[in-house]
Swiss-Prot record:
InterPro entries cross-referenced by the UniProt entry: YidC/ALB3/OXA1/COX18 (IPR001708), YidC/Oxa/ALB_C (IPR028055), YidC_ALB_C (IPR047196)
Role summary: Required for the insertion and/or proper folding and/or complex formation of integral membrane proteins into the membrane. Involved in integration of membrane proteins that insert both dependently and independently of the Sec translocase complex, as well as at least some lipoproteins. Aids folding of multispanning membrane proteins.
Lineage top rank: taxon: Bacteria
Annotated gene: yidC
Protein name per Swiss-Prot or TrEMBL: Membrane protein insertase YidC
Transmembrane segments: 37-57, 382-402, 453-473, 505-525, 556-576
Localization terms from the record: Cell membrane
GO biological process: one example: protein transport
Lipid bilayer topology: Multi-pass membrane protein
Subunit structure: Interacts with the Sec translocase complex via SecD. Specifically interacts with transmembrane segments of nascent integral membrane proteins during membrane integration.
Record key words, sorted: Cell membrane, Chaperone, Membrane, Protein transport, Transmembrane, Transmembrane helix, Transport
Pfam families: 60KD_IMP
Molecular function terms from GO: membrane insertase activity
């Protein structure tokens, strides 16, 4: 009984009890270090996987193509090709990356695909839809405002195609479409004007675009291609520059096509007259002389309609079925009419994220869900930029919390730079001696151990930040509501440097700001550290500092080149992330000077 009532305080003098406690603490620290090392290796592995998958799993700047992260299946959108009305024609506006949000229209596209034995939103399928924009308003076939964006006929049928469809029914009536020449460089002489008189046309060669049989068995992609072209062609020929010929006093043409074929016939007769060396009569000369309206229309046709035919895939050549001596343009099988560079990969469920591995399932999925949730509160413009700001702040705060100890322990490493530099100098003459190298590493390890610094802890910052940084970057690239955003004249899906090379100077502010922020965010920590080093630097420490500085300068140049090549949306993210880095650097620098840090935080860091 007496032994049971004995105070536990006497156990202090029991050496075996003390050794047991020390052993358990030592083992705990040892296993905890191993656990941290395993976690860091796993995180770095995730970062490397994400980096590799960024190239393997293709993304596209276009909505409706490449990897896309949607909040639900009902939001999966197609590739919408926007043709904007410009002078004398319709031109594809590559600065508009339209995201179809209308639920009724999206459901109609699903039903359309199902009715034609296709699957809407199937992984790696290509799709395409047409939208026509006039005076900042989308229109339908009647020229009326079209709130559903996608071009449709009077019955409400959309001009849409998915390459999983087995059939396709055109919404337009196919009519004759003519190209001036074969649309290749070697046929640049398909039209010839008299020297010093551009109103006298001496030669014109037309190539008819082949009509596609309307049988259900005919290839649906070719029928869609012809339907797509017909819609744009019909809209183009309704413009005043072409209609003026038909409305002119004494006009003998019922259609613009009739004007073209008549002109071709007249120039052919003129050529025969020249070959027979007959004298050209005044009547013959008048027949090949264009009026002002005819000259304007012909030049407009060359600059607007010919490119439409070419860019929509009708560049092949075959003998005409109606005339064995003539040829017509046919659809090139290798073309994908107005479709995107990559098949669409819509990802919605967590299971679909797992199909691409743990990087997507564990990191990209939650960040994408949060981003879509925040972005859903905004339509476009600055609202989407604000959503990116929220995502950056949340992820960076999370990283800052996880790397708090490492971030504020850097002052210790800075104080030890001088001592480490002395060790480096001590063994500088033994670069090729393996035994002396081992002794050098042992001394450096003992130095860090003495001051309670673990090299593993400094891997933590890279281990936590790298996978999250790549994951957010991937999300910014792949969330459609961000890809389709337009802010201060900048399309988020466009590569800024390409626009600048095309003399679209509005993109200069994005590239310039991204570069400036990137330079400051990398130079500022070095500049602040240099101020500290100069206060107490020795020769060895300055040599070590200069050596590290050269390496960092090379990395800065690499990052600058990388920044220039990014899409505008990612550059916006780069700017926001860089501003956070600058703010965090200044906060840490000044916070370390406060009495609170010196009296509370630093002692805690020294103990841990």
């Amino acid at each position: 009984m007496k032994r049971e009532n004995r105070s536990k305080k006497y156990d202090y003098f029991n050496s075996s009890s003390n050794n047991s406690n020390k052993f358990s603490k030592t083992n705990f620290k040892k296993y905890f270090k191993i656990f941290k090392l395993v976690v860091y290796i796993f995180l770095i592995g995730l970062a490397l996987t994400g980096c590799i998958q960024s190239f393997v799993v293709q993304s596209s700047p276009n909505v409706g193509a490449g990897l896309e992260l949607y909040p639900s299946k009902d939001k999966v959108a197609p590739r919408v090709n926007v043709y904007k009305k410009e002078e004398n024609g319709y031109v594809k506006d590559r600065n508009i990356n339209e995201l179809l949000k209308d639920e009724q229209s999206l459901q109609a596209l699903k039903d359309f695909s199902k009715n034609h034995n296709g699957v809407y939103g199937k992984t790696k399928s290509s799709n395409s839809a047409l939208a026509i924009l006039e005076d900042n308003t989308y229109i339908d076939s009647d020229g009326q405002e079209n709130k559903s964006i996608i071009y449709k006929d009077n019955s409400g049928k959309y001009l849409f195609f998915n390459d999983t469809l087995t059939t396709y029914d055109p919404i337009n009536k196919f009519t004759d479409i003519y190209a001036i020449g074969r649309l290749t460089e070697r046929d640049s002489d398909a039209i010839k004007f008299r020297e010093n008189n551009p109103k006298i046309i001496e030669h014109l060669k037309l190539f008819k675009v082949s009509e596609v049989p309307i049988s259900r068995e005919y290839q649906p992609n070719i029928k869609f291609a012809r339907d797509f072209l017909q819609a744009l062609y019909d809209k183009t020929l309704k413009l005043p520059v072409y209609q003026n010929i038909l409305r002119a006093d004494g006009s003998k043409y019922a259609s613009f096509n009739e004007f073209l074929t008549s002109l071709e016939k007249r120039t052919t007769n003129h050529l025969k007259t020249q070959l027979n060396k007959q004298e050209l009569s005044e009547e013959d000369l008048n027949s090949i002389t264009l009026s002002d309206s005819e000259s304007a229309a012909l030049n407009a046709y060359l600059t607007r309609v010919n490119p439409l035919i070419s860019e929509n895939g009708f560049t092949g050549l075959k003998k005409s079925l109606n005339n064995a001596d003539d040829f017509e343009l046919v659809y090139s099988q290798g073309e994908k009419i107005a479709q995107s560079d990559y098949g669409q990969i819509p990802v919605v469920t967590w299971g679909e994220y797992w199909n691409y591995g743990p990087f997507y399932a564990l990191l990209v999925a939650p960040i994408a869900s949060f981003t879509n949730w925040v972005a859903s509160a905004f339509e476009s413009g600055f609202g989407i930029v604000f959503a990116i700001i929220v995502v950056v702040v949340v992820t960076r705060l999370f990283i800052f919390g996880l790397t708090f100890k490492v971030t504020f322990s850097q002052y210790k490493q800075q104080e030890l730079q001088g001592k480490k530099a002395k060790i480096d100098a001590k063994y500088a003459a033994y670069e090729n001696n393996k035994m002396m190298k081992q002794r050098k590493q042992k001394e450096i390890q003992d130095l860090y151990k003495k001051h309670n610094i673990s090299p593993i802890d400094f891997v933590a910052s890279i281990a936590w930040s790298s996978p999250l940084f790549i994951a957010v970057w991937r999300v910014i690239q792949s969330v459609p509501v961000i890809k389709s955003n337009f802010f201060l004249g900048v399309n988020f899906s466009t590569a800024s440097y390409q626009e600048i090379l095309a003399k679209n100077w509005v993109y200069l502010w994005v590239v310039s700001l991204a570069l400036i922020v990137q330079i400051i965010s990398q130079i500022l920590p070095r500049w602040l550290a240099k101020k500290k080093i100069k206060e107490r630097a020795n020769v060895y420490e300055m040599q070590s500092y200069k050596k590290n500085n050269k390496t960092q300068n090379i990395m800065l140049i690499v990052f600058m080149v990388f920044t220039i090549t990014l899409q505008a949306g990612v550059q916006i993210y780069w700017i926001i992330g860089g501003l956070w880095t600058i703010g965090q650097t200044l906060f840490v620098h000044h916070f370390q000077k406060t009495s609170f840090f010196k009296n509370r935080v630093r002692p805690w860091l020294d103990r841990h």
